[in-house]
């Protein structure tokens, strides 16, 4: 019996395993939407000749040819002949700053993965471009010849054939310098730039040396400056940290003092505030016995990027309520106003306004009616589907007016006064007292009876 139960349990487990739903991975479209690839120089110009140490810009175009959903991906692999300069991710955005996809780069596999956002759920006709910066992998290229490089495109490959020339190093060590400056991007935080300035490697005697730094656009100072004094053997003999701040001309100064057989290394950081292709700073050294010497340094942004576009969904069509002419509006009641009787449309009160029906009188004009009820001629024509400004006596117009205006122009009803009598302490109305000008049918009747009685009396006496 136990064996039967065991067999039954095993069968149930097997069936359950087959029937259990499995989570499906998001669709990866690979390179199927990428239509073209090209190699460019750092100015974004297509090129075919490069040096072995050139920095190459790889540019792709893409067109989304079918519906895609958020969470789905496109992927590109980096050819073996190239090495990425920057492994930071980047957003693929439209011109309004909306993110179409987010790109991540796997340094180990050399794969760029673009994951679609919710943008693709509501937009169509998606297309765009992206780029990444790379150098040539010296292990996988041949210099002074054409190198076929296969790039993934349309889930196959497109071969580009750049000519890569060898770089010959020149002889000599170069003369010592007075000012030298260089910069680089931080390895992890691509918004931080590290700047290094070397002063007086030539070991020239300088009295009262002053260093001036001019910061280029797109960046601001970050923290302090570190000043290291070195002897003739470039050994650090003193270190000084100074606060730095920009003046109105985006300069800051550091007092270096007298330099006798000494050199100086200054380091400081800046924070990128505006995305640019490059960031430039200027270094200037002057002294009592030294005319100003300046050098510029530039850090190029070798990060990846891209942009795209999509057609947004059409705005929903607002359905207009069916037109109901004034003659067919449901009427709740009629009120007397300064402008004659107005019919109140049933259940029309909304946001402090109410719909009424006005009957056109002789001499009425559209501007006149509009002025009476504090509305515009255009509104009256719209509410009544009027195509001309002509009105006819007896014509009904529906108007949406302020409820406060209706209260203001409404004529209060005339109150009738009644005669009363007291019965057991309770006052009760016994009849309506006649108003001035009223006619009472009982007056002629009583008068007639009185005349008959008088005639009868005089007749008996005679």
Swiss-Prot record:
GO cellular component, one term: extracellular region
Family matches, as SUPFAM superfamilies: Bacterial adhesins (SSF49401), LysM domain (SSF54106)
Domain LysM residues, every copy: 356-399
Stretch forming the signal peptide: 1-25
Residue numbers carrying Pentaglycyl murein peptidoglycan amidated threonine: 436
Main location: secreted
GO terms of molecular function: collagen binding; lytic endotransglycosylase activity
Keyword Zinc-finger attributed: no
Keywords: Cell wall, Peptidoglycan-anchor, Secreted, Signal
Location of this chain's protein in the cell: Secreted, Cell wall
Motif LPXTG sorting signal: where in chain: 433-437
GO biological process, one term: cell adhesion
Protein name: Cell wall protein Lmo0880
Annotated InterPro entries: Adhesion_dom_sf (IPR008966), Collagen-bd_dom (IPR008456), Fibrogen-bd_dom1 (IPR011252), LysM_dom (IPR018392), LysM_dom_sf (IPR036779), SDR_Ig (IPR041171)
Coiled coil stretches, renumbered: none
Annotated Gene3D superfamilies: 2.60.40.1280, 2.60.40.740, LysM domain
Propeptide residues, chain positions: 437-462
Pfam families: Big_8 (PF17961), Collagen_bind (PF05737), LysM (PF01476)
CDD domains: LysM
Topology relative to the membrane: Peptidoglycan-anchor
């Amino acid at each position: 019996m136990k064996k039967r139960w065991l067999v039954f349990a095993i069968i149930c487990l097997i069936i359950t395993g087959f029937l259990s739903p499995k989570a499906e991975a998001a669709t990866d479209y690979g390179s199927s939407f990428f239509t073209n690839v090209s190699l460019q120089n750092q100015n974004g110009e297509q090129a075919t000749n490069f040096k072995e140490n050139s920095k190459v810009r790889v540019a792709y175009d893409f067109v989304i040819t079918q519906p895609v959903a958020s969470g789905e991906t496109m992927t590109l692999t980096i050819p073996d002949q190239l090495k990425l300069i920057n492994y930071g991710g980047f957003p693929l955005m439209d011109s309004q700053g909306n993110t179409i996809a987010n790109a991540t780069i796997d340094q180990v596999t050399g794969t760029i993965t673009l994951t679609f956002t919710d943008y693709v759920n509501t937009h169509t006709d998606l297309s765009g471009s992206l780029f990444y910066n790379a150098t040539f992998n010296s292990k996988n290229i041949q210099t002074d010849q054409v190198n076929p490089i296969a790039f993934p495109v349309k889930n196959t490959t497109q071969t580009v054939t750049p000519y890569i020339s060898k770089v010959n190093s020149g002889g000599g060590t170069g003369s010592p310098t007075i000012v030298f400056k260089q910069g680089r991007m931080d390895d992890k935080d691509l918004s931080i730039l590290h700047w290094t300035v070397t002063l007086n490697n030539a070991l020239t005697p300088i009295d009262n040396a002053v260093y001036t730094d001019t910061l280029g656009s797109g960046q601001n100072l970050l923290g302090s400056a570190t000043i290291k004094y070195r002897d003739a053997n470039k050994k650090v003999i003193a270190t000084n940290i100074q606060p730095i701040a920009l003046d109105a001309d985006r300069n800051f100064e550091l007092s270096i003092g007298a330099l006798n057989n000494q050199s100086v290394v200054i380091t400081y950081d800046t924070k990128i505030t505006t995305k640019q292709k490059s960031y430039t700073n200027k270094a200037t050294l002057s002294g009592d016995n030294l005319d100003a010497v300046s050098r510029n340094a530039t850090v190029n942004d070798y990060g990846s990027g891209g942009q795209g576009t999509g057609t947004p969904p059409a705005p929903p069509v607002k359905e207009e309520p069916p037109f109901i002419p004034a003659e067919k509006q449901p009427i709740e009641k009629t009120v007397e106003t300064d402008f004659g009787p107005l019919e109140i449309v049933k259940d029309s009160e909304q946001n402090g306004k109410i719909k009424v029906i006005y009957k056109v009188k002789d001499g009425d004009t559209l501007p006149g009616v509009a002025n009476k009820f504090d509305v515009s001629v255009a509104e009256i024509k719209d509410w009544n589907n009027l195509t001309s400004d002509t009105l006819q006596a007896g014509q009904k117009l529906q108007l949406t007016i302020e409820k406060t205006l209706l209260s203001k122009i409404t004529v209060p009803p005339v109150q009738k006064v009644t005669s009363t009598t007291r019965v057991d302490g309770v006052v009760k109305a016994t009849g309506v007292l006649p108003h001035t000008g009223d006619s009472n049918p009982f007056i002629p009747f009583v008068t007639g009876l009185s005349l008959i009685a008088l005639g009868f009396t005089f007749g008996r006496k005679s």
